Design a protein with these regions (language model features):
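Structural preference for solvent-exposed beta-strand-turn elements
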Residues: 1-202
Length: 202
């Protein structure tokens, strides 16, 4: 069977952390994951696994320890709201303007996004689990972004933010620091009239 091991990821990866976590919970002995991803989804996965009988410690930090167990049990579990989905709708609302309320969100999971939407010209009003996005006659302003591992700006919202910046006054610089070839949407935006110049990762 599988045996616990110490694993150091060469770079931060959500998918790699999740796969190692899922495998380690049923391995014999202790597994330690170094340079692990810290995203909310990692914490949520660990919480779910622990509810099922796993022994996961340190999720949400760069070092996760897992003590293998012989079996897991079924549970009822509600997953965390999807922050990328929330961010996509928020950016869509800010882009087209008007007044849109998003419910069942985790504000803290998108801490890097909200200030940038406000800098771009939208007004945000938060309640406990909702946000109201408003932009009427205010013109969008150019904002620069750098994608980063959590809690930085999510690479999965880079294309949506770029789309909003296509309608902004001024020049925006968008740097993609997570994935190569993550500007595949640029030619399509250019076909629709956007003025985009891609140079390497920006």
């Amino acid at each position: 069977g599988l045996k616990g091991a110490e694993i150091t990821f060469p770079f931060i990866s959500v998918g790699a952390t999740e796969h190692a976590l899922l495998t380690a919970v049923l391995a014999d002995g202790e597994t330690v994951l170094n340079n692990a991803a810290c995203e909310p989804e990692i914490i949520d996965l660990a919480d779910c696994l622990n509810a099922m009988g796993a022994k996961v410690i340190g999720a949400g930090t760069s070092r996760i320890s897992i003590i293998g167990v012989s079996s897991l049990r079924g549970v009822d579990y509600s997953v965390v709201p999807d922050r990328i989905e929330a961010g996509t709708y928020a950016l869509a609302a800010a882009t087209v303007g008007g007044r849109v309320k998003l419910s069942n969100i985790c504000k803290d999971h998108l801490g890097a996004l909200w200030p940038l939407i406000e800098q771009a010209g939208a007004k945000l009003t938060f309640n406990k689990t909702s946000v109201l996005i408003e932009r009427n006659s205010t013109k969008l302003k150019a904002v620069d972004i750098d994608t980063q591992a959590y809690p930085g700006f999510p690479t999965d919202l880079q294309a949506q933010f770029m789309t909003m910046m296509c309608l902004a006054e001024g020049t925006s610089i968008i740097r993609e620091n997570i994935f190569e070839n993550r500007f595949m949407h640029c030619p399509e935006l250019s076909r629709m009239g956007a003025d985009i110049d891609v140079r390497g990762r920006e």
